[in-house]
Amino acid sequence: MGKQQKKHSKGRLDRYYYLAKEKGYRARSSFKIIQINEKYGHFLEKSKVVIDLCAAPGSWCQVASQLCPINSLIIGVDIVPIKPLPNVITFQSDITTEDCRSRLRGHMKTWKADTVLHDGAPNVGLGWVQDAFTQSQLTLQALKLAVENLTAGGTFVTKIFRSRDYNNLMWVFQQLFEKVEATKPPASRNVSAEIFVVCKGFKAPKKLDPRLLDPKEVFEELGGGNESKQNNEAKIFNPEKFSSQRQRQGYQEGDYTLFHTMPIMDFIKQDDPINQLGSLNKFDLPAPKDDDNDDDDHDHEWKILSKLKLCTPELLECIKDLKVLGRKEFKMILKFRKQARDILGIDKDEKEEEEENPKIEVEPLTEEQKIDQELQDLINKQKQKAKRLKKNANELKQKEIIRNQMNMLTDMNIGIEAAQIGADSLFNLKTAEKTGQLDKLAKGKKKMIFNDEELAKDNEIHIDEEEINDNDKDSADELDELENQLDDMYHQYQARKAERDANYRAKQARGDADDEAWNGIEEDNDDVESGKDYEMESESDDDDDEHIRLIAEKKSNGSLSRTARNFFASDSIFNELSDDVILEEIENKTKGSNGKMVESIQEQVANDNNENDDGDNDEEESDFEIVPNQKSDDDDDDESMNSDDDEVSTTTKSTTHQQKVDLATVEAMTLAHQVALGQKNKYDLIDEGINRYSFRDKDNLPDWFIDDEKKHSKLIKPITKEAAIAIKEKQKQLNARPIKKVLEAQSRKKLRALKRLEKIKKKSDLINEDSGKSERDKADEISKLMKKLNKKQKQKPKTTVVVARGSNRGLSGRPKGVKGKYKMVDGVMKNEQRALKRIAKKYKK
């Protein structure tokens, strides 16, 4: 007998066929899953549980058993039996039945699958449309099993055919997985219509709509044939353009013929002529009447219609082949149909039905109804406006929440407080015009000049002093309130800045070292002098009235201004002031000095007390508690001249004071060098402390103004190169110190070494106490223990960098004299690195 040869249909015996034979795979499809696995991140190597649906003959299970980790669970299912495979569980079942689900759950217990594979296909051969739909149904059933058994973030790989259900399946995949891609591996034949879809990142929804996996819902046809209607319209109104394009429509389901006909009378009576003209090939005329047949209505109607003028021989020839007609011929057929329907009365019947059902006329509205309707419209508009405002408010609130979450804490309320106050307090001409006082109001001093006639009529000008005082009080109160609001806003700004900036918090904690200590209150005659100046100005001004000048003098005679009185009244120190205690303190300070000076001070204080008692006794009746001042350094030196203990105490005080000083700035280091080298002494430092910024008046000034002035009211002190180098070296020493984590790690390492040493000591003691061993054996065992203690970790070999120049240029192998790992570098790589940095810097901007 001759040798039987295998058929080479569709190139089945290609190189993958022979490779599968060599590798021992059961089918050439093994290389499909291998190529998919390599393309999509080696997901099989990370899978502990794998399910292979429609696994026969088991080639994909073979690949999974080789690539998956050891002791992985691999389950293969198919409707046909599968020969046993090592490390693979196989059973025979239909994946569309409940039996398959229960058996899968029995094998998996409480586990979830990391990967589900599906390479199944139905028995093909019935028809392409039917085969593709069956494959889509099978894929949906496999997806249903995968959804039940996949873990969150799992992978699903399936085979599908490109058909009209492909997009529906892809939409379902995208609802359940984060990443969905279609691919065709090289091992798949080009003539095959199969493609593979890889779905990664299973979302694992808690609730799943059952319609998402129902074939009736997923593969439901949408549109209702609108596309065919549009195509038919194109065939009728633009047949030349439509006929020039290739139509890849195929056959309709259940209709596998290309030639369609219809009786002419049915075409006339139907309501969709365009669709019929586009889909039919021919209209059949009524057959001649036989003697055996009864009278037919269609024959009678056609006899009437055949006598029309539009029923020409050309028309009868055109209806025999509709596919070759143009726009002119189709219009002729439609005109004939319209005339035929008019003669047969088909359109008249429809008009009569419309006449039987007359249209309902709307009666005009009355005046009251119109008013009610307008009111209702206004109410509806108001509701819509309120709804819109509410929506805008919600949007603003949402934006504010987002701004707070992103730490965009810019104060948007700056100026609102001032606007609320100023809107009522500012002068407005409109309000003055409404009250009729606009003509009486004047601007500046010119309108305050009185004419001689007016003075003759009114010899005495009566001005209510209480009204003037009230106006002054109101304006002063407003100014005080504005100042308080500015102070509050500045404090809020400081609090916000302290929350954001740690350096600012530290600066606030340290305080301002430049601020001088408060040494009490000295009497000042600034207010009196200002009152005198004001008096001189009022006398020199000829335009002012004498009565107004007298009132101004009376107001200026007060000892303190309003702000000063508020300051002294708010401070508890001045409320508790006692003159007797002050006198005692002055006596103690001036003891041993000239007695006349003491007596003069006492007399002066007594006179001041008498004057103040006549004025305001209630404000100064409280007590004042004074803490005695510390003794000066000179007094301490005088008193402790003969005592050694005091000398020791002073030296300890000076040493502690020196320890607190930290030379952290270049200016401080420069000053320390100058003092140490004798370039400056104590008196030079005192002279430098007196400058144009030393005695600047800061009383009654707001904090925000003082803080802003401090930034600029500073002397720039000279520095030296040696001081800068010293500070730099100091910073280097600080930076050289390891961080806290490194110190903790080193201490933990030492602690572990000490623990190991303690263990070795205990073991060595036990070895020494063992009398059954010789001294040599004891020494050997103890030396072995010490070797374990001193054992160091292996260091990784360093990579040697070899420059490709000279003899190494163009070298393909290992350079001479280089051992271990090495890396070849050249000038091109350096230029490339520079270019990459330059590009990154460019796009960073």
From Swiss-Prot:
Keywords: Coiled coil, Methyltransferase, Nucleus, Ribosome biogenesis, rRNA processing, S-adenosyl-L-methionine, Transferase. GO terms for biological process: maturation of 5.8S rRNA from tricistronic rRNA transcript (SSU-rRNA, 5.8S rRNA, LSU-rRNA); maturation of LSU-rRNA from tricistronic rRNA transcript (SSU-rRNA, 5.8S rRNA, LSU-rRNA); rRNA methylation. Residues 513-528, 536-545, 610-624, 633-648 have a biased composition (Acidic residues). One of its GO terms (molecular function) is rRNA (guanosine-2'-O-)-methyltransferase activity. Residues 366-402, 464-502, 739-796 form a coiled coil. S-adenosyl-L-methionine binds at G58, W60, D78, D94, D119. GO terms for cellular component: nucleolus; preribosome, large subunit precursor. Residues 223-247, 279-298, 496-546, 587-660, 788-821 are annotated as: Disordered. It catalyses: a ribonucleotide in rRNA + S-adenosyl-L-methionine = a 2'-O-methylribonucleotide in rRNA + S-adenosyl-L-homocysteine + H(+). It is an enzyme of class 2 (transferase). Component of the nucleolar and nucleoplasmic pre-60S ribosomal particle. Required for proper assembly of pre-ribosomal particles during the biogenesis of the 60S ribosomal subunit. This is AdoMet-dependent rRNA methyltransferase SPB1. It comes from Candida albicans (strain SC5314 / ATCC MYA-2876) (Yeast).
